Regions:
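Bacterial N-terminal signal peptides that target proteins for export
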Residues: 2-26
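Alpha-helical transmembrane segments
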Residues: 28-32
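C-terminal motif of bacterial Sec signal peptides marking the signal peptidase cleavage site
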Residues: 33-37
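N-terminal "mature-domain start" segment
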Residues: 41-71
Length: 198
């Protein structure tokens, strides 16, 4: 017995049906692409832990640690986009100080913007875009977002600050404004990963 022929769709399908079918297929492809991008955004992070085990954070795969003699305790930068950096600065503060004693998230964010990110005479202007307070592991963190304006370009910076045992920890990730939409989620994951462990 000969196999029955495969059904053939009539060529005279209504154009509205074809339009809907095309829209569904295109929508499914776009959703699939979007979901694969979301799942990849959490991937590609490595853990850095201080030699004494005091603190740890995540940094993007492919970034290299850079040795610095003055300033930040730890610096990483992207090999491909060399103006993308991640740095940890540790400063001494009064042992009795808490982050809340230094001011609200907005007050601390504005002060860091004026003194650290865009000090007078630096040629930079820092605009505090957002300041959020969060609790994690019994510590208060301030997560800060800045738009930084320089004479020849604009940059974006995310930072988190926390006080513990007389030290102010500031972890900051920075990129140029053109790359910001591509790395925003990644940078948020990095700065909120900072933890005090002992």
């Amino acid at each position: 017995m000969a196999p029955s022929p495969s059904p053939v769709l009539p060529l005279s399908l209504p154009s509205s049906f074809l339009t809907r079918l095309f829209s569904w297929v295109l929508g499914a492809l776009l959703i699939g692409a979007g979901l694969s991008g979301c799942s990849a955004s959490g991937a590609g992070l490595n853990t850095f832990q201080s030699p004494d085990g005091r603190y740890a954070f995540l940094y993007p795969t492919g970034w290299n640690r850079v040795a610095v003699s003055d300033g930040p305790q730890v610096v990483f930068h992207d090999l491909i986009n060399s103006d993308e950096t991640l740095s940890l600065v540790i400063s001494d503060v009064n042992d009795t100080n808490s982050l809340e004693n230094l001011g609200s998230a907005v007050a601390v964010g504005e002060k860091l913007g004026r003194i650290v990110i865009a000090p007078e005479g630096s040629g930079r202007q820092a605009e505090l875009v957002e300041a959020i307070e969060r609790e994690d592991g019994g510590h208060t963190f301030y997560d800060l977002e800045y738009a930084v304006h320089l004479a020849d370009r604009d940059r974006h910076e995310l930072a988190t600050v926390v006080v513990d045992r007389g030290r102010l920890y500031t972890l900051a990730a920075s990129t140029n404004e053109a790359r910001w939409p591509k790395v925003s989620d990644l940078f948020h994951s990095v700065i909120t990963s900072f933890t005090l462990q002992i």
